[in-house]
């Protein structure tokens, strides 16, 4: 069997796509948090988001990662709804 040309740490296509989904979710959460009017609330939410992503950084199980992305999207939508209500 021929040796692979790819380095051992190369992501599969599925892993690459999941990583992009996670990074997009992270960016969207931070962008939404920037809209929070109160400085202390904004800092708390930013620290919370960073800690959650940092804590789950080592997850490798496909189903677990998919579930966390779904939960993150639901929390993002909840934050967006809360901000919309606060502005109205």
From Swiss-Prot:
Keyword Mitochondrion in annotation: yes
GO cellular component, one term: mitochondrion
One Pfam family linked to the record: Complex1_LYR
Keyword Transferase among UniProt keywords: no
Localization terms from the record: Mitochondrion
GO BP term (any one): mitochondrial respiratory chain complex I assembly
Domain of life: Eukaryota
InterPro entries with a match to the protein in the record: Complex1_LYR_dom, Complex1_LYR_LYRM2
Function recorded in the entry: Involved in efficient integration of the N-module into mitochondrial respiratory chain complex I.
Family to which this protein belongs: Belongs to the complex I LYR family.
Protein name according to UniProt: LYR motif-containing protein 2
Lineage, opening ranks: Eukaryota, Metazoa, Chordata, Craniata, Vertebrata
UniProt gene name: LYRM2
